[in-house]
Curated annotation (Swiss-Prot):
This is Small ribosomal subunit protein uS5. One of its GO terms (biological process) is translation. It holds the Pfam family Ribosomal_S5. Residues 19-82 form the S5 DRBM domain. It comes from Granulibacter bethesdensis (strain ATCC BAA-1260 / CGDNIH1).
Length: 190
């Protein structure tokens, strides 16, 4: 009696594999043993669907392709959703840090492009953000930069989510005021 293949853990359907992956860094590492050194490779990979979901993962193995495969699997399991403004930039400026890695992410006007250093650029390209200005202030270690970028992205929130948390309207959060009848004439005279 043949069993039907399961659809992953929890019975969830597998998503269409429209996920792109970017290799951030690969590093040869050594384990010192009695007979000398054992070499392995450590890989850091960022994955995303370019629609607001992104994740990162690290993998280590004796061969480069196996390390990249492990890192990619871990990255797919650690994906987060980031709210984007108009599908191209962040809603607000945000700061993040991990260890000595500190990053500042700023939303940008249309046509600005991705102004960011190497590891951060891979995160934004995988995320689908087209306009952002980012600056790394601390450690230049790729692992710390990526983790600091994710710490910042996790702090991002949309005006709609802020409004629902506070029990207000989105217009109250954004500071847009509707003119009250009778005040239009007063503003013209002032």
């Amino acid at each position: 009696m043949a069993r039907e293949p399961r659809e992953g853990r929890g019975g969830r359907e597998r998503e269409a594999d429209d996920i792109i992956d970017k290799l951030v860094t690969i590093n040869r590492v050594a384990k010192v043993v009695k007979g000398g050194r054992r070499f392995a490779f450590a890989a850091l990979v960022v994955v995303g669907d370019q629609k607001g979901r992104v994740g990162y993962g690290a993998g280590k193995a004796r061969e480069v392709p196996e390390a990249i495969r492990k890192a990619t699997e871990r990255a797919k399991r650690s994906m987060i959703r980031v709210p984007m403004k108009e599908g191209r930039t962040l809603h607000h400026d945000v700061y993040g840090h991990f260890g000595a890695g500190k990053v500042v992410l700023r939303s940008a006007t249309a046509g600005t492009g991705i102004i960011a250093g190497g590891p951060m650029r891979a995160v934004f390209e995988s995320l689908g953000i087209g306009d952002v200005v980012a600056k790394s202030l601390g450690s230049r270690n790729p692992h710390n930069m990526v983790k600091a970028t994710f710490a910042a992205l996790e702090r991002c929130s949309s005006p709609r989510s802020v409004a629902s948390r506070r029990g207000k309207k989105v217009s109250d959060i954004l500071g847009r005021r509707e003119p009250v009848a009778g005040q239009e004439g007063e503003e013209a005279h002032a």
